[in-house]
A protein has these predicted regions:
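Polar/charged low-complexity regulatory segments
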Residues: 1-36, 94-137
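Amphipathic alpha-helical packing elements
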Residues: 34-77
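Amphipathic protein-protein interaction modules
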Residues: 59-115
Length: 137
């Protein structure tokens, strides 16, 4: 299902994948525009906040105060952890491959089947699944 205002998992803020999507989910939920089945604060959102070493509720509070994505990311760096270039490289590689030959592969196969994508060999990762699922109207 296409959701206006929800960016791709692949899009980067400050070089970091998924962070912008987490912010979008926070904002959309506050506006009542995020479907209930979108995990908030768990799954990849939780991984992202753990990577930055900030608590999800604190990120929600800061995001809803306003500011650009870059300002909120800088807040995360100040309150939590500013990852180095190599850490970001490893994070991005890890996240963009989730679902491909790992512990998320079973979940991905189930979700593909539920959404009618079982035949889609191009969907090999969770990020690919998000992209395909959200392209559907």
């Amino acid at each position: 299902m296409k959701i206006s205002g929800l960016r791709s998992s692949y899009e980067k803020v400050g070089g970091i994948v998924f962070f912008g999507r987490t912010l979008d989910k926070i904002r959309l939920h506050a506006q009542g525009k995020l479907p209930a089945d979108y995990n908030r604060g768990t799954g990849f959102d939780s991984r992202c906040t753990r990577f930055l070493k900030v608590e999800y509720p604190a990120l929600v509070e800061r995001t809803l105060q306003g500011g650009t994505d870059e300002e909120i990311l800088e807040w995360c760096f100040q309150k939590g952890h500013r990852p180095g270039e190599e850490e970001i490289l490893v994070w991005n590689a890890f996240m963009t491959k989730r679902g491909w030959r790992d512990d998320v592969s079973g979940w991905l196969a189930q979700e593909k089947k539920k959404r009618g994508f079982a035949h889609r060999d191009d969907i090999q990762t969770a990020f690919d699944f998000h992209k395909a699922d959200e392209a559907e109207d």
